Amino acid sequence: MDRRSIIKNAGIAGVLAAGIAPAVHAQATIRWRLASSFPKPLDTIYGAAEVFAKKVSEMTAGKFQISVHAAGELMPAFGVVDGVQQGSVEMAHTVPYYYFGKNEAFAIGAAIPFGMNSRQMSAWMYEGNGRKLMNEFYAKYNLVSFPGGNTGTQMGGWFRKEIKTVDRKSVV
């Protein structure tokens, strides 16, 4: 084999190798906006969305960027689901029971007073078809849900009147 043949074959191999290079290098960066129902100072909850966005960026070598926006920056805190439904933002970080007024079933997608504890909720979501059932429900609202954390059993209760004394008869 002469030198010209080697150079020609190496050139062909180089062109072929370039042609089969991963398409990921040619893809444009995807940029999504995440509207949160939570303010920045609530770092235990709001911060979870920031950590999520950072991890997605790291796992995609920066090709999928999520900008996280606190409550009120892009829309009202309790309007983030409407924002996703209308296409104003691509993602929301919220708690389903905030949307109880749309449908009472929104309440069971998160901790509720006297409801499941964190282990029970995780077991139901991942082993008891809870995620599947919730997404069947959310599909009616043009939504897809991914559990994004678990704060445990609801801290406190939901009452019609402000509690000012230890007298529980007035709230029962």
Model regions and ranges:
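Alpha-to-beta junction loops
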Residues: 62-64, 80-97
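Extracytoplasmic "Venus flytrap"
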Residues: 33-50, 71-75
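Extracytoplasmic small-molecule ligand-binding "clamshell" domains
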Residues: 66-84, 118
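Structural recognition of the beta-strand scaffold that forms the well-ordered cores
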Residues: 33, 66, 91-94, 144-148
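Immediate post-signal peptide segment of exported/extracytoplasmic ligand-binding proteins
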Residues: 20-37, 57-65, 139, 162-170
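Contiguous mixed-secondary-structure segments that line small-molecule binding/active-site clefts
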Residues: 54, 85, 95-172
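Short, polar/charged alpha-helical segment
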Residues: 42-67, 129
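N-terminal secretory signal peptides and thylakoid transit peptides that target proteins
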Residues: 1-14
